[in-house]
Structures are given as C-alpha cells and as structure tokens.
Amino acid sequence: MRIALFTETYLPHINGVVTHVKILRDGLLQQGHEVLVVTADYQTRQHYVKDGILHCPAIKSKRFYGYGVASPFSRRRLKLVQDFRPDIIHIHNEFGIGLSGIFAAKQLHVPLVYTLHTMYDDYLYYVAPRHLLRVAKKISHDYFRLLGNAATELTGPSPKCQEYFQQIGVKKAVNVIPNAVELDDFSPDRISAENKSAFRRRYHIPDDVMVACFVGRLGHEKSVDVLLDYWARTITPEDRIMLCIIGGGPVQGELEQQAKDLGIDSMVIFTGAVPHDQMPPYYASCDVYVTASLSDTNSISMLEGMATGLPVLRRYDALNENVDQVRNGVNGYIFNSPEEMAAELRRIKNLSPEQLSILKASVIESVKRSGAEALANYTYNVYRKAMANAPNSKEK
C-alpha cells in the first residue's frame, strides 16, 4: 500500500505527534508499504522530496513553539503528492499541512484517515485571552467538526477522543489505536549503570532517595501545578522521595516559583528540556512515573517510562478512565487524591528488592505490544476499512 502521512512537524523536532508518526512510518516500511511523509519546513523555500519526506516551505512561528506553519494550498505540493500515487492519505494535525492533506484527498479521490492526537480544549489559552475562551471553544468545535466529517475514518489514541468527537457533533466512530514507543531505545538492558549513576550525581540525589519523575512540555494543561500542590500537602523530607520534573515550557518559571512558595524546592528538581535521544537514562535513573495531567490522550512519555520499567501513578481521569494505559497493580496505580498518591509512593518505596523487580517486570511486559509493528498493524486495518468504505476506491 502507498501511504501519505501529513504532519505539521517532523524530525528533527520532537513531540508526541512526531514520535507517533516516526514509529508508524518505521512500522509500515518494515511491512513493505511505501510511505511519504508530508511536513512543514521553515528552512526551505521550495518543495522537495528527500528520503521519503516531502519538505514544504513554511514560516517559523514563535506562537507554535518555533515550528513551521505552511500554507494549506500549493499546486506544487499537490503535484508531488499526486506523483507518489497514494492509496491512503492520513493526516495527524489540523492546520496548514493537515488542511493540505484534506484538499489532496479530495482532489485525488483518495480515502482520508484523520488521527486526533490532542484535546485542544485544554490548549485554547495559548491562542485566546481568558474572556474570549468561550467564543474560541465554539469556533474550535465548529472547525474540528468539519475536519472530522471530512474524514473517511477517524482514529485516536484513547477513548477520550470518541468523547470529544461526540461532544462536538461528529457521529462517526473512532478507531482507538494506542500510542507506541520505541521499545529497543528504552529497554533497561541497553542503559548502563554508569549512565544511571551519572544522573544521580548530576542532581545530587542520595542513593537512599526514591525519585518520581514527570516528563513533558511544561504548559498549564499538564497540571504540574496540581502535582506540586499534592506534593506539598502530603510528602515530607523524611519520606526521602524527590520529584523530578523533566522538560521545559512556558510555565517552567512559574512552577519553579510555586515550588519555592510551597516550601518544597528542596524535594523538587527541574531539569529543563532534555534532548529526546538522551532521555533513556533519565527514565531509568528514576523509580516511578507520576502525573496529574488530565489533558493527555495516551501519553508517549509515560509509555517510554514504562518501557524502562517505571510503574505509573496517574490521577484518575473520568473521561479516559485510564483503562487503556494504567492497570492497577499491573503497571501502576490510579490515585483520586493527594493522600492516595502519597500512600502509593510510600508503598512502592517500601517494596523489597524482589517485589520491586517483579513489579518492574510486569510494567515492561505490559508495553511489549506497544512497538512499531503493533502500531502499523492496527493502523493498516483502519486503512483497509477506509478503502473499503470510500467511494471510487479499490481495497488493496
């Protein structure tokens, strides 16, 4: 099958969508499919294809994290996509490149698959002042309803995506395809004891201290402020448990000040942004992954931590019900309150080495089917369904 993946950002940028698209591309290529990635590139002034990637001219945007923003319409881009002769067009974002994918699918009479990766209601504060959030939400819902209705098939990494589409008036069912992780890169067998020791030395963490980490971009939607508040209310220095916040973002300064104001700055480490290829020893040097975020659909950072053996403590999410990623007693625990979070942290800290080894093995086992092959298989089945259901298209 010939598949065109449309994404606003791609390597060398790193975010959840980029990671998902890269793993999907790798899995599809391994299965013998042909893949073209169509992406914005603010470093070029003309369209060109290299190594299976169609680079599209774009303008660098400070508002969108320094990524490129491309025009949705380009005859040259359409011609290059047409030359690829795609059987399926699969869009992963909703802006210039995503709209370009919708336009190309319509012009070329190709089935369109649309993956919703982000709960955009949680991100509207980036583009609209507080007093206009209600209006912005309505406009956003109208826009995403158009996108959803344009697609032949919808996918999303968690049941929360189905809830969102139903809320905005899209009647189609969502094919839930969990996110994937590069299992080999995060295997604890490939991370040396020296690299793990170096992490603790760098941040002056004693050997008897347990480290709970959160990994992600530091924006309000990640609820790290809630995590800090929970920490201040329930964890003391005598617990010998530290919180390591790995990542950078627009509210990092606010969070660092919050930790000081709460009097917990001696128990909290802010590493700032860390290159993705340097992340494996960061995860492996910690003991547990903890998050209070309710905005994630299916956290790739959490999966990466689990691939290194980190049990997860996650705040209960009524919409997501967490059933797709965290299973109590198998690979982590769901908490409903700061007290429950603290109790689980202390319980894990007090496990014997044998008990901890069994738990870590269970965590790793739980993500063994979360690699590139599984993602490609799930997605290929959706492509087959889209081709069967689309007019003027023959299933391959």
What are the residue ranges of the model-derived segments?
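N-terminal subdomain of nucleotide-sugar transferases
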Residues: M1-H55, A374, R384, K394-E395
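Carbohydrate-associated surface elements
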Residues: D41, K160, A180
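Short alpha-helical donor nucleotide-sugar binding micro-motif in glycosyltransferases
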Residues: G148, T271-V274, P281-C286
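Conserved donor-binding/catalytic core segment of Leloir-type glycosyltransferases
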Residues: T155, P206-W231
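Nucleotide-activated donor-binding/catalytic signature segment of Leloir-type glycosyltransferases, i.e.
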Residues: E254-A273
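Aromatic "clamp/platform" in nucleotide-sugar-dependent glycosyltransferases that forms part
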Residues: L294
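Short hydrophobic beta-strand element within catalytic cores of glycosyltransferases
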Residues: P311-Y316
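Conserved acidic donor-binding segment of nucleotide-sugar-dependent glycosyltransferases
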Residues: R327-E339, R347-P353
